[in-house]
């Protein structure tokens, strides 16, 4: 029968070891995400998958924040983050650094997540949008591609931290399948 792992069996990295460890070449960009709980959850998932960072834009809350810390469980201390006053500035900086920028949004001519194949030679940035308005159209326009999560229900809407986790995992899954 399966037995739950004890904390000491999980080989968890401390913050210093995490900072020094190689990261997956994926940055999550939060475009005016208003809920500090969503921000904290995204930090926690980015830590779980050892991503390169989280970039916070516009009205998105930034550390230090008691509420971010509560949801992130301290991941805001391990995951590198930057703040930009606009998401457009963040996208421009990412493109200047050679990242492929992918907005996660429901759009005409989007690529379904199930059809997306990453290029292992590329570094990626995922733009996650505001809880009500999604990714701003000017950011979608500036993106290299748009990824859409297939949905079959009545709402066609997912919580931004849940959607971020779904897409992050697909990137991690594909990198692992390539042996990276």
Can you say where each PLM-predicted feature lies in the sequence?
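Post-transcriptional modification and biogenesis factors for structured RNAs
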Residues: 1-180
């Amino acid at each position: 029968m399966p037995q739950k792992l004890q904390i000491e069996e999980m080989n968890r990295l401390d913050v210093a070891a995490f900072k020094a460890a190689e990261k997956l070449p994926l940055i999550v960009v939060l475009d005016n995400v208003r809920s500090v709980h969503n921000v904290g959850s995204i930090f926690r998932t980015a830590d779980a998958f050892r991503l390169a960072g989280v970039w916070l834009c516009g009205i998105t809350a930034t550390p230090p924040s008691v509420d971010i810390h509560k949801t992130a469980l301290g991941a805001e201390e391990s995951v590198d983050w930057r703040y930009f006053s606009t998401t457009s500035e963040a996208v421009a900086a990412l493109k200047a650094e050679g990242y492929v920028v992918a907005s996660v949004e429901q759009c005409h001519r989007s690529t379904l997540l199930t059809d997306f194949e990453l290029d292992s030679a590329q570094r990626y940035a995922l733009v996650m949008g505001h809880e009500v308005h999604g990714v701003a159209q000017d950011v979608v326009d500036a993106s290299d591609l748009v990824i859409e999560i297939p949905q079959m229900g009545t709402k066609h809407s997912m919580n931004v931290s849940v959607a971020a986790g779904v897409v992050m995992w697909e990137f991690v899954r594909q990198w692992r399948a390539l042996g990276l």
